[in-house]
């Protein structure tokens, strides 16, 4: 998403102002691909006082900005507040998160920085819930989100893609939103598929048959409708995409944004429907420690069984899986 956004922006900079910005980006993309690097997108700034522009902030480090320009590069300072996978990336792509006016020129900066560059401090929470037996998903699959503070970090010129070009920086931000919302549709559709499958399993474990339980069937239909609805927007955005000015493919903006609006608003309905399909055990089930407690294991296995042909342990595992996805510190 970030590379796609920068592709057109740097091309436009060269077309309008001249320079080597686009060539630098292409060289960096080749470098990242050749070395199989994981690149974290450092885009969302701390933002400070939301009523003020970046250049009006009492604390200028609320936004990443250029503090010094040298012949061989730039120096940047400021905070990026939400970096997915931050601690386990090789490098950060630093990019502006909003439209910059001419007075915000120093804040219109995009560049590539190794995460161990001098002056970077990364603060993060652990990814998921490793080692937690109740975390049926996030014990193995999760993501960490980082805050990164750049304290006068030097960036060589060959890694600088945007520096003060506010109009092109705005185009980059808009393009990134389109690409990222498009890819987010696929991610959330996959999440919806997990809930649909888990909902089918928990109903069976609870002893219910969708063919004979109309109100449950309606909830499952709603869950499928929501998931496939925004996924269809993703398909439409893909098939109706166009080539941008630089010749790069861009998904359709309208369907990318409609899909993102649908999933962002209806993710809460997806959680609610998963809970309706599951029942109270999702949040009330005893700890997995009790599954092996000789004083309670046999009793729980007997009285908390649902369908007689479905073992209690399977019912418990599915319930904990849904809890992990929808009602835990990771997915709630």
Where are these regions (language model features)?
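Internal helix-loop-helix
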Residues: 1-39, 85, 91
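Beta-sandwich/jelly-roll carbohydrate-recognition scaffolds of carbohydrate-active enzymes
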Residues: 26-29, 51-56, 60-65
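A short, Trp-centered hydrophobic/proline-enriched beta-strand micro-motif
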Residues: 36-49
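Structural beta-strand/beta-sheet cores of well-ordered domains, especially the beta-sheet scaffolds
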Residues: 37-39, 72, 90-92, 107-111, ...
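A short core secondary-structure module
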Residues: 79, 83-131
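Glycine-rich beta->alpha junctions and the first turn(s) of the following alpha-helix
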Residues: 132-226
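Long, well-ordered mid-to-C-terminal structural blocks that present hydrophobic/aromatic surfaces
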Residues: 191-269
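Alpha-helix capping/hinge segments and adjacent helical runs
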Residues: 254-332
């Amino acid at each position: 998403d970030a590379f796609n956004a920068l592709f057109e922006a740097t091309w436009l900079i060269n077309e309008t102002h001249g320079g080597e910005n686009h060539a630098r980006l292409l060289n960096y993309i080749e470098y990242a691909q050749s070395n199989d690097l994981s690149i974290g997108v450092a885009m969302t700034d701390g933002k400070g006082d939301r009523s003020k522009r970046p250049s009006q902030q009492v604390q200028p480090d609320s936004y990443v900005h250029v503090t010094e320009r040298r012949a061989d590069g730039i120096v940047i300072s400021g905070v990026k507040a939400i970096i997915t996978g931050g601690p386990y990336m090789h490098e950060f792509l630093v990019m502006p998160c909003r439209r910059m006016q001419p007075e915000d020129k120093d804040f219109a900066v995009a560049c590539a920085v190794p995460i161990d560059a001098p002056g970077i401090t990364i603060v993060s929470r652990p990814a998921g819930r490793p080692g937690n037996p109740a975390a049926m998903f996030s014990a193995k699959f999760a993501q960490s989100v980082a805050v990164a503070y750049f304290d006068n970090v030097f960036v060589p010129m060959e890694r600088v893609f945007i520096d003060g070009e506010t109009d092109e920086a705005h185009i980059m931000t808009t393009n990134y939103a389109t690409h990222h919302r498009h890819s987010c549709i696929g991610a959330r559709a996959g999440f919806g598929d997990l809930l649909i499958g888990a909902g089918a399993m928990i109903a069976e474990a609870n002893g219910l048959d969708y063919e004979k339980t109309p109100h449950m069937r309606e909830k499952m239909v709603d869950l499928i409708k929501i998931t496939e609805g925004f996924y269809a927007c993703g398909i439409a955005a893909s098939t109706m995409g166009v080539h941008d000015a630089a010749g790069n493919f861009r998904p359709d903006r309208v369907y990318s944004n409609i899909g993102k609006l649908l999933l962002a608003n209806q993710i809460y309905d997806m959680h609610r429907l998963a809970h309706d399909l599951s029942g109270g055990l999702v949040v009330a089930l005893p700890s997995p420690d009790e599954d092996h407690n000789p004083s309670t294991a046999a009793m729980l296995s007997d009285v908390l069984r649902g369908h007689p042909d479905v073992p209690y342990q399977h019912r418990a595992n599915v319930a904990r899986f849904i809890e992990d996805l929808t009602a835990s510190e990771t997915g709630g």
